Amino acid sequence: LFGIDHRDKNTALGGENSDTIIIASVNNDTKDVKLVSVYRDTLLNLGNDTYSKANAAYAYGEAEQAITMLNTNLDLNISEYATVNFNALTTIIDDLGGLDMDMSYAEIVHMNNYCVETSEETGKDYTPIELPDRPDDIEAVQYHYHLNGVQATSYCRIRYTASLDMGRTERQRKVIQMIVDKAKSAGLSTIFKIMDDVFPMVTTSMDKTEILQMLPTLIGYSVNDTTGFPSSFKFSNVKGSVIVPTSLESNVIELHKFLYDDPNYTPSATVLANSQ
């Protein structure tokens, strides 16, 4: 799943960085879904031994290059994808009637700030949340609000709290989990409406008929575990502020343990070379 900061709603998706990169692993036997966010500033081989931030691969070669980057650096075999923008996400959430969210004071402040731009880009309205009295710990999650599409999308954009981009990606995975859970309880008629409303806003490797055939099975699946990649890293100023896996080899081993319950995975020669 790629998320694009796509400002011009009248042009096709492409040419922008994918500031959201989420890998979904679906186990059709257990009906379990695992999600892994690849941090956008992760230093990876984007192709031809060009090392840069992972989010730049989409801008260089759209989904094809971004998927190749993931497959070659992480020893994966991803073949399907979907790319969404702010408008698609706000529409999904509004069609579901919004989301109930527990938040910190800091998250409320930043969400309200992001809402201004998100509303302008999507053409959708929102009501700013009135700030409570400032607590001693502004990072403590202690407030509960019902968010509409603009607000929940803005919540997904927050990256200026103490948890930085790790917190941003965790919020995104949390919202996806909430969307899946609410869609399952909403029923097929709502799911099909969302499909009709959102599909024109999505770029995907799958056709609409294929997706429609899959939707009835959604109710049986659950997103049960999520994490971020890399799990072990350091910050560096190589080619800008980047996240450097320490090392790529060990992180790929941990990734395969998480995604596939494989405790004895041996990374490929390509991963070993990229890990140097």
Regions found by a protein language model. Give the residues of each.
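Non-catalytic, solvent-exposed segments at the cell envelope interface
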Residues: 1-276
